[in-house]
Regions:
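Extended recognition/assembly regions associated with phosphoester-bond processing machinery
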Residues: 1-251
Length: 251
């Protein structure tokens, strides 16, 4: 559309190679943000009107692996990106944003893989079979049938979404697997339930709607843009998600 989105959220890792003194130096890391600034400089309406949020990933530089993780320090951002963008935030991970009366949570972690390793029992699909749906088709809209079919095909992500929302916390794992700063534990809370949770996970792009205590929370995995060009667009007014992809030819 002619009007650009109001908010862009970038979740790390911001380099293909994990940051480290022997793999990726400070100068190369800063240069990547300078290159992004040069690209955005060609689109005045975007850099002047839109808000940008950068959330570090597990492979980005930081002083700890415990959550919540602080935002990228100024020394690693360079000066060009902050000079180019009028509205830019280098936020913590996770990050909570209040946007047009909606509560949005962004969390970058390969949580689905972690949960799979710690899963004692596999997710149980209690939705029945498609034959059961056929017997109930008079009481079920086509949209509801499609939703149940999608849930049946991908129960693991739904299982993770329900776990996070029901426990009202972003970590379903013991501290030995996912350490947390107790003094900052409130940053991991999901109470009251947010309108949407964006989980930056390297698994496939997915979107699920959970309904806990009659509070609908949309959980989205936008995918990994660096791997296959996938990303997600969220429309707050309709509470709809558009899972998109940029082809290799376009990139």
């Amino acid at each position: 559309s002619a009007k650009p989105p109001g908010l862009f959220v970038f979740m790390g890792d911001f380099t293909r190679v994990p940051f480290g003194p022997t793999k990726y130096d400070f100068a190369s890391y800063t240069k990547s943000f300078d290159q992004l600034a040069d690209l955005l400089d060609e689109y005045p309406s975007i850099r002047e009107e839109c808000r940008f949020v950068f959330i570090p990933g597990p492979g980005d530089p930081g002083n700890t692996s415990a959550y919540p993780r602080p935002g990228l320090p100024a020394a690693l951002r360079g000066h060009k990106i902050t000079a180019c963008l009028q509205k830019v935030e280098f936020a913590s991970n996770p990050c909570k944003i209040r946007w047009h009366s909606q509560d949005l949570v962004f969390f970058r972690d390969d949580l689905q893989a972690r949960a799979r390793r710690g899963c004692v029992l596999p997710p149980v699909d209690d939705l029945g079979t498609e034959e059961d749906d056929e017997r109930l088709q008079l009481d079920m809209s086509p949209k509801e049938r499609e939703r149940r079919k999608a849930m049946r095909e991908k129960p693991l992500f739904l299982h993770l979404a329900m776990t996070l929302v029901q426990q009202s916390h972003l970590s379903p794992l013991p501290l030995t697997q996912m350490p947390i700063y107790w003094e900052r534990d409130q940053a991991m809370w999901l109470y009251p339930a947010p309108n949407a949770i964006f989980l930056g996970d390297r698994s496939e792009t997915q979107c699920k709607m959970t309904d806990v205590c009659n509070v609908g929370t949309t959980m989205v995995n936008p995918g990994c843009f660096a791997d296959d060009g996938s990303f997600a667009i969220y429309y707050p007014s309709e509470r709809e998600v558009d899972l998109s992809v940029v082809s290799a030819a376009e990139m």
